[in-house]
Amino acid sequence: GTALHGIHYTPPVASAQVKSAVLLAGLHASGDTVVTERQATRDHTERALPVFGVSLTRANGAISLRGGQRLRAAEVQVPGDASSAACWAVAAAALPGSDVTLDDVGLNPTRIGFLSLLERAGARIEISSGVPVGDEPIGSLRIRHGHLTALEIGPADVPGAIDELPVLAALATHGGALRVTGAGELRHKESDRISALVAGLRGLGGHVEEQADGFQVLGDRRLTGGTADAAGDHRLAMAFALAAIG
């Protein structure tokens, strides 16, 4: 291949993976690399790179770094994954009488958008901050069941909860309702998560409608059980399991 050179890049869709790939490539390129986001996405890469010796700047939605910097070894502790915590949080929110506490969860603000959505849906949530790990905040979550209500998730909500949308769909099958728009990126994950999610929840007896950039779950029908194909996608597998509980 040819030598890499720095670029100024604005991703056409909000994608932390694309942003991270460009930044990491920029370390091996000549000159400066700048990634400018129209919508903020998870920022683990920007927080982690300085721990490994990389100098970068962040301002007004732009992340800049100079190529040729060498990474240095570091000992780090990885916080508990917020997306994995979301499954237990949804289970607690869905089942009457539930009261679940999760410790040492990563509370990076770009990863916990699902918590405010759960609260809007009716869950009762308490957050206790702990000692940060490096530049990553951590803490404990307490989630209790509450009366579930209809939830509207729009384009502004999606980047902070993109991976948790399938399990939030599962929550809506337990009551309330859910409408998601502006989430076309779901079609380009490990599977077409919109089509596969809708098909799977329908297979379990759910009242679900597919849209070009989202879906709608009408919580007016109790699931009857059935077969749901997760299409080899772990997030869909977790969503279908959560829909089936209770």
Predicted features along the sequence, with ranges:
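Structural preference for solvent-exposed beta-strand-turn elements
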Residues: G1-G246
